[in-house]
Amino acid sequence: RGLGDVYKRQAYAVRKQTPQNYKDYFDKRIHLIEVKNFGRVIDPAKDIAAFFEVKKIEAKIKPDVIHLHSSKAGAIGRVAFNGKIPMFYTPHGYSFLMENYKPMKRRMFKVIESVCAKRNCTTISCSVGEHQESLKLTKHATYVNNGINMAELQEIIDKTEKVEHPFTVYTLGRICYQKNPTLFNEIAESLPDVKFVWIGDGELRDQLTSENIEITGWADRSTAIRYAVNADVFLLPSRWEGLPISLLESMYMKKACVVSNVIGNRDVIHNGENGFVCTKVEDFVKAIEECQGEVEKLTEHAYQDILKMYNTKVMAEQYSKKYETAMNR
C-alpha cells in the first residue's frame, strides 16, 4: 500500500523553475492546494501572509498528519501549528550548510532551525548524514532514506532506444552553484578525449566552457533518461546535497557513479564498493579513468542497494509506520 492510498492532500508553492505541467507528476488521488504567498526568499510581508494562509488551510482540511518539507516550510509550519496534530519536518538539505550563503546568513539560518527544533515536531531526515546534523538540533529526530519509483523508471528505460556511443560522462540538474559546474568543467578539461553531457540548464551555463561538454538544455523526463541510458558514468560534484534522486536513479540504471564527498552522496556511495567518492579534481579524474575498465561488480552492488533500501516501496512503508505510530500516541 502506498502513501497515496491514505494521505490525500498536499499544500505546495511554485518556484520559477517549476514546470508548467507539474500537476501531471502527482498521483490523481492527491488534492493539491497552492500556498500563494509562499516564496523561497525571506520576505516578511509574504511570510506572515503565508503563515496565516497555512493556518487557514489546516483549519479547513483538519489533517491527521502534517509533514513540512524544506527549510522555509519547516520554519513557517512549526511556528504556525501547535503540535496537537502529529507534525514532521524534512529539511532536504539544511540551509545553514549551503555554501552559497554568506557566513552571517548561515548562522542566522542555524539559529532559526535551533529555535524551531524546540517545537513539538519530529525531524525526518532523508539520509543518515542529514540525520546526524538533525541530532545536533533536537533529540526528536529520525530518518527515512529517499527512494525512487523503480517501476516508473523501468517503464521509461524499456521504451528508450539504446545506441552506440563513445565513453560518456553525464550529470543531471540545474546548472547552479550547488551543482558545482566549475569543478565539472575542470574535470572535463582534464579528460579531453571523454564526452561530457550536462542534462539540464541554468544561470551558470557560461562556466561550462570545455569543448567536450554538451549542454542539453531543459529536457522532459523521457529525454533526460534517454541521455542517461546512453552514457556510462554519472558524475555529481555537488557542494552539498540532501539525498539526490538523480544519483539513486543512476545507480538503478547500473551507471558507475562518481560523487563529491558531501552529506547525501557519501551516505549512499561507499568508495570502491558501489561507486567512487572524491574530493580533488585528480580524484575525480582517476575514478572516471577507472570506470573505463571493468566496473560490473561495483555497478551491480549499487543496483542491489536500490532494490533493498532506496526505493519508494521501502520509503512508503517506513513513512506509514512513523505516521501511524504518531497518530496512535
Specify the residue positions occupied by each region the protein language model found.
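Membrane-proximal helix-turn-helix segments that form the acceptor-binding/catalytic region
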Residues: 52-56, 106-123
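Conserved donor-binding/catalytic core segment of Leloir-type glycosyltransferases
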Residues: 162-179, 185-189
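Donor nucleotide-sugar binding/catalytic pocket of nucleotide-sugar-dependent glycosyltransferases
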Residues: 31-34, 114-157
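Conserved acidic donor-binding segment of nucleotide-sugar-dependent glycosyltransferases
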Residues: 270-282, 289-293
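Aromatic "clamp/platform" in nucleotide-sugar-dependent glycosyltransferases that forms part
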Residues: 239
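Short, small-residue-biased leader/transition segments that mark boundaries at the very start
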Residues: 2-7
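Short hydrophobic beta-strand element within catalytic cores of glycosyltransferases
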Residues: 256-259
